Amino acid sequence: MGSYQSEKRYYLHIQLLDIVPPIWRRIVVPGAISLHTLHKMFQVTMGWENAHLYLFRLTINEKTTVYGLPDPDWDDAGLRIRDSRRTKLDATVWAEWLKLTYEYDLGDSWMHQITVERIEHVADESVYEDALWITPRCLAGERACPPEDAGGVGGYTLLLEALQNPRHPEHEQMRQWAGMSYDSELFSVQQVNSALANLD
C-alpha cells in the first residue's frame, strides 16, 4: 500500500452485525483515501476475499447517500449510487458522531457498522515522515469473518452448528467446504497488517 499525505487520520471500529460473539476490528487509516480504497482495506482487515459488490451508506438527518461502483448493467433499484472511487473519506465522514454502514456481498448481505471513534488532525507537516501517520494499520480485533458465500447470517449460524458438533450429519461436509483449517475464533493483527502493507 502506498503512502498517503493526509491532514487527518481516522480511528474506525468495524463490526459485523447480527453475529454473537461479535466479529470486529479497530483500524487507523488516513482521511485522504477514497471510499473504494477503504473498501479494499476493510476486505483485508475483516478477512473477506473481495469477490462481490459492496455499498457504503451514510445517513444524515434521515437522508441516506449510497456509495459504491456504479454499473450501467446492474439494476441499482433507484439507489443513485455515487462513485466511491471519487469520494474521499474525510470529505464524506467529517464528524466523529457520524455512522457509516458497509454492506459486502449484496446476496449474502453482510452488514458492517462503521463507527468513527476519533479523528486526529496533523499539527505539523513533518509528521508526514512518520509512517504511523500515513500507513493504514489494524490495532485490534476478535474472531475470523465467515467464509465467502456462507449464506448470510443464517447460513453462517448453521455452518457453525455443523462445525462445532462432530456428531452433526453435515459435520465433515461443512469442514471440507469451509476449509479444514477454518477456525471461527482465529484472528491475527500481525497477519492483517502484513497484508495491508502489501495491498495494491
Label for each model-derived stretch:
Residues 1-200:
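Short linear regulatory motifs enriched in tryptophan with gly/pro/ser
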